[in-house]
């Protein structure tokens, strides 16, 4: 059985812990907290009521039993009530003028990079990283998998050189030489 880095590829995909596991280069990644809020469907005339998700200054996902509002982007964690108020205020134009009844909330950290692009690519001869997908992980993580697999297998990458450079793990080195290390989140 090969050990780490001997004859087989290793992929580090450990959110913010990837920063400590990738020792060959400094990654500017960290946790940024966010909160989703579930509210009772607001009392809005049926002609004005949403029937589809809205994404903009936050997002609103209407449902029969609850609507979901989100999401905060907190460099340092906020009190839940502050986050709820932010989500309601950010989406007020879709919620009508009546009272809003919060039902519950869910808080979590998301790993992000200093430039908000995911970190995807080779960090040494046998190691790749996939991290900092932020709130777009359901789109960028499968893309990361295809990039890493194509590199491991020696295939043509499924992205332009510009896209590869924007996600490359070594992109922080030159920036840090100019400005120092940028701290991300908590």
Language model feature labels by segment:
Residues 1-6:
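A conserved short coil-to-beta-strand element within the FAD-binding core of flavoproteins
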Residues 7-8, 34, 88, 117, ...:
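A generic alpha-helix preference that emphasizes hydrophobic side chains
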Residues 100-186:
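C-terminal catalytic lobe of FAD-dependent flavoproteins
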Residues 7-18, 145:
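Short hydrophobic core segments
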Residues 16-125:
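Active-site substrate-recognition segment that forms the wall
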């Amino acid at each position: 059985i090969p050990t780490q880095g001997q004859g087989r590829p290793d992929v580090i995909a450990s959110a913010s812990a990837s920063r400590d596991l990738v020792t060959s280069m400094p990654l500017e990644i960290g946790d940024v907290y966010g909160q989703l809020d579930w509210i009772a469907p607001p009392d809005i005339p049926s002609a004005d009521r949403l029937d589809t998700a809205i994404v903009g200054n936050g997002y609103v996902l209407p449902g029969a039993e609850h609507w979901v509002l989100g999401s905060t982007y907190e460099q340092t964690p906020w009190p839940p009530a502050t986050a709820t108020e932010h989500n309601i205020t950010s989406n007020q134009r879709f919620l009508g003028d009546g009272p809003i009844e919060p039902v519950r909330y869910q808080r979590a950290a998301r790993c992000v990079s200093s430039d908000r692009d995911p970190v995807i690519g080779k960090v040494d001869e046998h190691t790749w990283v996939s991290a900092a997908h932020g709130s777009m992980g359901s789109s960028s993580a499968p893309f990361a998998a295809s990039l890493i697999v194509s590199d491991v297998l020696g295939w043509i990458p499924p992205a332009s050189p510009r896209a590869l450079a924007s996600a490359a793990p070594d992109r922080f080195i030159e920036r840090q030489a100019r400005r120092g290390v940028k701290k991300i989140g908590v």
